[in-house]
Amino acid sequence: MNLENLTTERRNENTMGLDEMSVKEALQKMNQEDQKVAMAVGQELAAIEPVVEAIIKSFNQGGRLIYMGAGTSGRLGVLDAAECVPTFGVEPEMVQGLIAGGQKAMTVAVEGAEDSKELGRQDLVDLKLSANDIVVGIAASGRTPYVIGGLEYATTVGAATATVACNKNAEISKYAQMPIEVDAGPEFLTGSTRLKSGTAQKLILNMLSTISMIGIGKVYNNLMVDVKPTNEKLVERSKRIIMEATGCSYEVAELKFVEAEENVKLAIVMILTDSTKEEATQKLIDGNQFIKNTLN
């Protein structure tokens, strides 16, 4: 295995002598390196766009978005998937994160898990992967066998495939229809891909899930109108979203929120179209769940 040619494994000339720096100097250096990440991601928008479009297509045909990764890459996929539930009001099955070694690997390393192609395949078999789904393999190094095994299996069942790697000409790119390769340069701490690579991956996963959810009507203007009010903070946020979307008072927002059985999107349509709960429900069905389509 030839790792020394990978950007993520090279020493960073800008951060030599870390152990001789003051805390202030080290913080400044780290911040300087982190600022390069968003710029690097920005260079890959043309590669990210078709992946978002493929995810929207998958969702529209009842498919799922499945992230796969090992270590930090896997944890980031699990994190993004978990946040889709409260943010966009989707079922947990719609966006899922698989990590080599399973749930235990979220907190401790599982020996050998990332090196098993068969484990990657089996995890997708267990999910009953179908041609309607899309699999996004995540690997900073771009060579994780667990991810490659999953991508190979996904191809055999006809699922769409994409990858997120932090090295150019990554091995996993050969196994995906839509590879994303972002080069943010060597890590602040040599080889520690939880840092810049992890940040780059998080930014890209944010884009994939968020822009895809916009594409299926989960957002009105820039408001998350399918938020699930699962705690007191989110209940209050829900009422504010209704106020922002409609220009109504807090009292009206609260009333319609209750009438709509805490369904923010429904409450907004009820107010904007002066409809009953039943009428607003039908308008959303007719409008494919987009608020803007109920206003025509």
From Swiss-Prot:
The question of whether Lyase is a record keyword is answered with yes
Q: Does this UniProt record's set of keywords contain Phosphoprotein?
A: no
- What domain of life does the UniProt record list for this protein's source? Bacteria
Alphabetized SUPFAM superfamilies for the sequence: SIS domain
> Active-site positions, per UniProt?
83, 114
Q: Which reaction does it catalyse?
A: N-acetyl-D-muramate 6-phosphate + H2O = N-acetyl-D-glucosamine 6-phosphate + (R)-lactate
Domain SIS, by residue range, is: 55-218
For molecular function, the Gene Ontology terms on record are: carbohydrate derivative binding; carbon-oxygen lyase activity; ether hydrolase activity
InterPro entries under this entry? Etherase_MurQ (IPR005488), Glucokinase_regulatory_CS (IPR005486), MURQ/GCKR (IPR040190), SIS_dom (IPR001347), SIS_dom_sf (IPR046348)
Q: Which residues cross the membrane?
A: none
Q: What UniProt keywords apply to this chain's record, in alphabetical order?
A: Carbohydrate metabolism, Lyase
Associated pathway = Amino-sugar metabolism; N-acetylmuramate degradation
* UniProt record, GO biological process: amino sugar catabolic process; N-acetylmuramic acid catabolic process; peptidoglycan turnover
Q: What is its EC number?
A: 4.2.1.126
SUBUNIT field: Homodimer.
**NCBIfam families from the xrefs?**
N-acetylmuramic acid 6-phosphate etherase, PRK05441.1, PRK12570.1
**UniProt miscellaneous comment:** A lyase-type mechanism (elimination/hydration) is suggested for the cleavage of the lactyl ether bond of MurNAc 6-phosphate, with the formation of an alpha,beta-unsaturated aldehyde intermediate with (E)-stereochemistry, followed by the syn addition of water to give product.
**What does the UniProt record say this protein does?**
Specifically catalyzes the cleavage of the D-lactyl ether substituent of MurNAc 6-phosphate, producing GlcNAc 6-phosphate and D-lactate.
Per the record, the similarity remark reads: Belongs to the GCKR-like family. MurNAc-6-P etherase subfamily.
Q: What is this protein called?
A: N-acetylmuramic acid 6-phosphate etherase 2
Q: Which organism is it from?
A: Enterococcus faecalis (strain ATCC 700802 / V583)
Q: Which gene encodes it?
A: murQ2
